[in-house]
């Protein structure tokens, strides 16, 4: 926050913060801040998903991807998952966290990224557990379209119950 919004305000402009609202810098910061809030509220996430009594562990996971050594073509794309909840009931919640000022719409491109993350995780970890796609958004998902592929949905309000 300091590097993006305090240090950059070298002239002491009292309207600097409001002038940055909606900018790519502000949007990026808000997304990172929302992810941090989610990470600090895992017990509320578990409760909202209905498995607070199930023993579980929280992880992140990443995979660099794989390229053909001869052609250099991508064999498997890389993937990063910021929040995995690995439950003792043979289920893993693969959590995507998205901050927006309204309902979040999953585009075709975003759907492909989410599916790639899940496929890479299952393939590389060789898990036999059920993997549930879980979206945590500020104001919910736009119904229909690619949101039908999401198993569990939570909103920011669920983090503060």
Each predicted region: which residue ranges?
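Short conserved micro-motifs at the rims of enzyme active sites and ligand-binding pockets
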Residues: 2, 94-96, 106, 145-148
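Conserved catalytic cores of phosphodiester-cleaving nucleases, focusing on short active-site segments
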Residues: 42, 81-101, 114, 133
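Domain-level recognition of nuclease-like catalytic cores that cleave nucleotide substrates
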Residues: 127-161
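Accessory nucleic acid-recognition modules appended to NTPase machines
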Residues: 1-80
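Arginine/glycine-rich "motif VI" loop of SF2 helicases in the C-terminal RecA-like domain
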Residues: 119-129
